[in-house]
Amino acid sequence: MTNNKKRKASFLARRLNTLVALVVILTVLLVGYFMVRGALTEQVEAPTTTEEEFVLLPGEVTVKSGSTLVYPSLDKNDLSEIKIHNAANEQSRGEAYVDWGIKFLYDEKEKRSFGYMIGHEEDLYLDETQLTLFAAAVGNVIFSRRVVDVCDDYSIYGLDEENAIRMEVKLTNGTTYVLYIGNLNPSGSAYYVRSGDTVTDENGASYERKAVYLLSTSTTSYIASTVAALPTDMLTPLMAYPVNPELGFTTFELFSADGKIRLSLRPRTAITSADKLFGGSTFNYYAVEPAGYFSSSAFDTRIEVFEMFQGSQVMEFGTKLVTGVDEDGKDYKYFDFETDVLAKYGLDSSRVEYILRFSSKQDDSATPVESEIWFSSLQADGFYYARSLNFSTIIRVDPKTVDFLGWETIDFLDACALRVSIGNSAKLTIKGTNPNGTVFEESFIASSQLQDSEYIVKSVKAEKLNKTLSMTYYRELFRELLAITLHGSVPSDLDKKALMEETPYFEIRIETPKYNKSDLYPEGLESVTRILRFYQYTNGRALVTVEMVNADGTTSGENGSFYVRVSRLDKLLTDAQKFCNGEEFSFRDKE
């Protein structure tokens, strides 16, 4: 968690401008916004308290449209801070929700606004959409009627210090306006409010404003959804730092509840050029765990989710301040949660279902920024709940947003057990046992030429037979090879160790060429051998292992997480023998 605090607000500010808030309440606020705008642009009848001509009191302002405001109209760029005291929040959510506030900031580079909750500068952010809606609520406090010019008992309207919501609006020029928000009127359509400001009369005497107002219905709607709401309703439900879709991930790791890593991916740029030959040019990530595989196109499309990785609503923010010094001697702080709060959302340590960690860059020169999220299991209400370690929040998440949590590991990977282009195969060896017990083993040596930035196989020779074979049927054989696909995970109770002590049912070896330095491979390429071994454990299924052997003798691989269909191996064995014998055969796509 310590490392997750090493970040700057400017990083997020550069990306928040791409986000569209998903919280349902903002839709309501947007409607309210146009109601407020309409009130400012249309002529309305001036509020009156008697049949006599309405007279403005000190501090009140009438705008050109005819609307009358408790204090002057404010633009979003005028705002510096908004501080709110709402004692009613203590009973429903706790003491930390009573006093809260928003700091407004402006990013000169991006020409966009962003903000954060005061006291949570590195945790709780608001994007420009939310700030605009909030600013509209406090910037145009329109009243429909002045109830009383001088009030002697504010408690009648819920405007006494003990019960009212107190809002303090601080401007960039240092001016401050204070507004108290009390009860709703009997019909429930409008709030009673009063100003907490001091004004000066025409004689130069200063006094506290004591008038009580009834807000317009549009302003009431806005206030109810922002100032009078819980602070969590205004927060951007980000689960992690946004990912630049053009750069993707530098790391991606998904763990199960028991701490076992289900998937670990790295970008193709992080592996050797020789390894890339086995992935072709279409994959974006290769697997560190399970090793030897490449990411599937199904996962690649999920990068769009992480560009704006959000839930639907912030439910809680951390209230327990934790401070300390990290291993580098730097001070850190973060806000943690009480155990009962975590338990409420299925996020206590014994019930966390998934842990997701990834890192990403915002540009090529930037240092990768780490994100970490803990997920509950799917809860009875039909949602996941996520604990963001970056933002110290608990967020409600629609299952559609994180559908990949329910994937099997194989769903993240390419189905093809062996991805390699025919032009990058210098030597292909096939070894298997026929039904009569005889063993077939042959190596096919391919000669390739560079043509239009691609190596094209021109001829192929069977090594043992010492015979040149048909290129047409070599291509058919290679299609059979690439059609061997992963079909699922092997049973958890399978004794893989004992199985792999036996002779493999089938074996495939592919060795890439050694390429000298050229325009296509400026640094040259050493040869790499990829070995697939298949161990049959039922009549129709065979466990597959992957081993990569580098030119320097070092190896890496994966020991049997998935299975393939034996029928596909049998077809390849039969066709390889027909190929050597000069017999006709054809690729069969279906198993």
Language-model features and meaning:
Residues 2-591:
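Soluble, acidic/polar mature domains that operate outside membranes
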